[in-house]
């Protein structure tokens, strides 16, 4: 059982971990710079109560499911948020956004488009499915999503920015079309 858990954990971390972009991608770095937030939260990280450490010291969500980020809570998006990937079974995952300055989950309209669940598959025409890898920076409200289809190895990408609506709700606004990966943003 432990071997399966370690294998699954390794796969999830490899596929869904948020990693910094290659610094040679100057155009994308410039785009992140265009969408800088006013301030990055540097205070005490407040982990929402819905996360608990198990006997092995790994974070699990309120359903007891493994949380696939690097098992450390840190700001990785738009100044005070962390995007967290949750396991819901084999090749099944969904994401939540946590406000680490307040220790609470935040509903962001459009975030579920990056999920891969039974009721909302990322690739409806794919037998094997795929995954969406998200690229973010702590000091920017820009989010780049790359979608990889396991059946075809086709990679597509698109860009979004986090917007706060007049009613106070948050929404991801798409600012590009879905294009082949490594296409510079226009």
Residue ranges and their predicted role:
Residues 4, 17-52, 129-186:
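Acidic, small-residue rich beta-repeat scaffolds with periodic aromatic anchors
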Residues 53-71, 76-77:
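Extracellular/luminal recognition modules and glycoprotein regions
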Residues 4-13:
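Sec-dependent N-terminal signal peptides
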Residues 62-63, 67-69, 124-135:
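Signature of short aromatic-glycine-proline-rich micro-motifs recurring in repeat-based ectodomains
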Residues 85-89, 123, 150-153:
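Short consensus segments that form the blades of beta-propeller domains
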Residues 73-111:
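Mid-length scaffold segments of soluble, non-membrane domains
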Residues 110-124, 182-183:
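Surface-exposed loop and turn segments in beta-propeller and other repeat-based domains
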């Amino acid at each position: 059982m432990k071997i399966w858990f370690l294998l699954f954990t390794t796969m999830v971390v490899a596929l869904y971990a948020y990693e910094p972009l290659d610094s040679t991608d100057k155009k994308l770095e410039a785009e992140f710079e265009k969408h800088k937030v006013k301030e990055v939260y540097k205070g005490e990280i407040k982990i929402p109560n819905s996360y608990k450490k198990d006997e092995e010291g790994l974070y699990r969500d309120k359903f007891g499911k493994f949380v696939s980020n690097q098992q450390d809570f840190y700001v990785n998006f738009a100044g005070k948020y962390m995007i967290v990937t949750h396991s819901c079974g084999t090749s099944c995952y969904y994401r939540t956004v946590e406000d680490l300055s307040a220790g609470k989950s935040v509903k962001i309209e459009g975030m579920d488009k990056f999920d891969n669940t039974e009721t909302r598959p990322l690739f409806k025409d794919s037998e094997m499915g795929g995954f969406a890898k998200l690229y973010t920076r702590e000091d920017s409200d820009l989010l780049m999503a790359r979608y990889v289809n396991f059946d075809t190895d086709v990679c597509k990408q698109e860009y979004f920015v986090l917007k706060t609506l007049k009613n106070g709700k948050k929404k991801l606004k798409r600012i590009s079309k879905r294009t082949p990966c490594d296409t510079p943003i226009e």
